[in-house]
């Protein structure tokens, strides 16, 4: 009988601990999102990179929207595993915002870039970023021109280009499968100002 009481008590304590940890992780993720959005607002107003928390090794560099999907996320600098846990991020091997070349953004397939599964050719992608050279907030719209699935070693879509392009990359297939043997690539080209789509 004593064993049964200890077992029940231990089970209850374990349940409370596991529930508490789950609530803590959820609250931490929600708070991180709020802090990242605030940091982007400060960056967009001040023109100074502003980390979302004092010990962050990244900072918001852009806001990306896909209007047809209602997608609206803040893009972080440097696509490291730690950064990608908090949002889509710029690959440092690609062009910088507003610079000529292939601007490359990465995100997890089961969170930040999950909506890419339903992106279609002809969709508009809008990017806002602070241009430190011009000291102003800028916006550029892109038109999705190519969607493909490639092997992880096929990095041709991430190669530097002389033409402006926006390349979004995530693992494939979508969903929660532990394996991701391929990459899903969305390539978009800038829309000339004043041009209708």
Indicate where each model-derived feature is located.
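Solvent-exposed, non-transmembrane regions of membrane-associated and secreted proteins
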Residues: 2-197
């Amino acid at each position: 009988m004593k064993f049964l009481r200890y077992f029940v008590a231990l089970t209850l304590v374990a349940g409370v601990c596991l529930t508490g940890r789950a609530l803590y992780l959820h609250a931490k993720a929600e708070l991180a999102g709020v802090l990242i959005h605030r940091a982007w607002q400060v960056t967009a107003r001040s023109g100074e990179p502003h980390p979302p928390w004092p010990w962050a090794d990244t900072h918001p560099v852009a806001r990306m929207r896909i209007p047809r999907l209602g997608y609206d996320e803040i893009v972080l600098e440097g696509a490291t595993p730690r950064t990608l846990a908090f949002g889509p991020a710029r690959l440092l091997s690609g062009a910088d915002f507003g610079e000529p070349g292939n601007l490359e953004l990465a995100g997890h397939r089961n969170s930040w870039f999950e909506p890419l599964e339903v992106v279609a050719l002809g969709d508009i992608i809008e990017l806002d970023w602070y241009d430190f050279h011009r000291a102003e907030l800028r916006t550029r719209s892109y038109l999705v021109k190519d969607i493909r699935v490639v092997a992880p070693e096929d990095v041709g879509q991430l190669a530097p280009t002389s033409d402006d392009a926006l390349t979004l990359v995530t693992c494939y297939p979508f969903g929660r499968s532990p394996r991701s043997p391929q990459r899903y690539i969305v390539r978009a080209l800038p829309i000339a100002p004043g041009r209708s789509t």
